[in-house]
């Protein structure tokens, strides 16, 4: 299955859940960095008060969401950068935010990119993941996945299977609209230590994989 089909052929929350366990990698020109997606959030577009495209808001900053599914949308908050992929057809501005990966490739380089932070601190959050990839700009914003150094491996035989996938509310969402703030649109591997804010007491055997 190609990216255009994968990111448009079902609802955005279904796409987000299916991404759990798939390899996400970034080729920095020297080697492949990355790991298995363990946490991701769906943003449902114009009706979603937490989405950057809520109410049809469109600007150069969020243009990536309006492109066809499979387009990279990188946005910045202060000095931090976040990796999203647009979902659905062009002008239907939905997307998925990848929040965390379980490192598997280029771990030593990712630790170096994180200024020596190791263990769960390498990639247990969306900005940390981008730092681990050595990304400090929006250069790959608006590129289609297949035309970028990013790869999401869609081969099912390369996907790791979680013992349990949890659906929960998204992180850091404004509570002014409790309906959207509390929608269970964040998916993660139960007990995986790289999930943001996972408590040590909740760590699962084998990081939550089967």
Curated annotation (Swiss-Prot):
It comes from the Bacteria. HAMAP family: 3MGH. One of its GO terms (biological process) is base-excision repair. Its EC number is 3.2.2.-. GO terms for molecular function: alkylbase DNA N-glycosylase activity; DNA binding. InterPro entries: Formyl_transferase-like_C_sf, MPG, MPG_sf. It comes from Lactobacillus acidophilus (strain ATCC 700396 / NCK56 / N2 / NCFM). It holds the Pfam family Pur_DNA_glyco. This is Putative 3-methyladenine DNA glycosylase. Belongs to the DNA glycosylase MPG family. It is an enzyme of class 3 (hydrolase). Keywords: DNA damage, DNA repair, Hydrolase.
């Amino acid at each position: 299955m190609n990216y255009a089909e994968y990111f448009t052929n079902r609802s955005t929350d279904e796409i987000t859940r299916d991404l759990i366990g798939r390899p996400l990698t970034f080729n920095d020109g020297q080697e492949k960095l990355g790991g298995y997606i363990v946490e991701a959030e769906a943003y449902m577009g114009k009706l979603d008060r937490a989405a950057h495209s809520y109410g049809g808001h469109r600007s150069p900053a969020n243009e990536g969401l309006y492109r066809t599914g499979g387009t990279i949308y990188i946005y910045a908050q202060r000095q931090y950068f976040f990796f999203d992929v647009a979902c659905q057809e062009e002008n239907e501005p939905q997307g998925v935010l990848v929040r965390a990966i379980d490192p598997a490739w280029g771990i030593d380089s990712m630790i170096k990119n994180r200024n020596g932070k190791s263990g769960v601190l390498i990639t247990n959050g969306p900005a940390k993941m981008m730092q681990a990839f050595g990304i400090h700009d929006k250069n790959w914003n608006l590129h289609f996945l297949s035309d970028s150094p990013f790869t999401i491996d869609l081969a099912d035989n390369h996907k790791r299977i979680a013992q349990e996938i949890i659906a929960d509310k998204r992180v850091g969402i404004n509570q002014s609209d409790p309906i959207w703030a509390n929608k269970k649109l964040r998916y993660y591997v139960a007990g995986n230590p790289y999930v943001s804010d996972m408590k040590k007491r909740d760590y699962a055997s084998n990081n939550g994989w089967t």
